[in-house]
């Protein structure tokens, strides 16, 4: 506990909140161009080949974004929309690509949770 004299000398510093998705610069989503599309393995105890893309955003940042869903059509120079949201078992992946917008098509034959994967209602 500081004394009154110590508080006069230098005031308390406000706690600065640190953003979990700095590359979005306070925007809900950002547009970007894929520079590389590849797979990486998750950390223990999980095992898989997770699809990710290296994306150069309009804000100037180069980030790694996860491609959700089964199957995708993304390749180099694809224009994608990126939202925040990390992938727990992939260190360094703090963004998701939004399916069903720009060059990222929705997941094929998706019946449930369609809105999260950019799929229209089946007829």
UniProtKB/Swiss-Prot annotation:
InterPro entries: NA-bd_OB-fold, Ribosomal_uS12, Ribosomal_uS12_bac. GO terms for cellular component: chloroplast stroma; chloroplast thylakoid; plastid; ribosome; small ribosomal subunit. GO terms for molecular function: mRNA binding; rRNA binding; structural constituent of ribosome. With S4 and S5 plays an important role in translational accuracy. Located at the interface of the 30S and 50S subunits. Exons 2 and 3 are cis-spliced, while a trans-splicing reaction is required to link exons 1 and 2. PANTHER family: 30S RIBOSOMAL PROTEIN S12 FAMILY MEMBER (PTHR11652). Belongs to the universal ribosomal protein uS12 family. This is Small ribosomal subunit protein uS12cz/uS12cy. The gene is rps12-A.
